[in-house]
Every structure is written in structure tokens, then in C-alpha cells.
């Protein structure tokens, strides 16, 4: 697969929250400690991979926090 050319530097996903959760990932950007500390040393390809992992971690967290839906469809109110 051909690598996509990047015309602009890959921006840091930091949101300025900078607090670690129980698994060691930042609560704001979902990067690990090593990913945060080594961000400026990474190539653009490595940064893109970290961003992909961050999106994956965010989606996993959102799915875990989503309430279980009931099997019965919700009936709209007539009033």
C-alpha cells in the first residue's frame, strides 16, 4: 500500500487535560505516557498510527459507557 504524502505536520491531539486514567492513557487525547513523551521524536507515519490508536481507544470507551438498549422498542407518547 502506498504511503500518503503529508503536506502539513501532524498536529498533536493534546487537549490540555493531561490526566491519566486507570489504564495509563491520557483522559483528553487517549495517548499513552510513552506516546505523549515521544511525540516530537516520531515520524509523521508513527504519529498517524498513534492517532489511529487514540481514535480506537476513544471508541472503545464510548461503547463501554453506552447504556445497554432494551429489546423492546420504545413507544412514542401520543400526548
From Swiss-Prot:
Organism taxonomic ancestry: Bacteria, Pseudomonadati, Pseudomonadota, Gammaproteobacteria, Enterobacterales
Gene Ontology process terms (BP): response to hydrogen peroxide
One Pfam family in the UniProt entry: DUF1289
Name recorded for this polypeptide: Uncharacterized protein YdhL
InterPro entries (UniProt xref): DUF1289
PANTHER family tied to this protein: DUF1289 DOMAIN-CONTAINING PROTEIN, OXIDOREDUCTASE
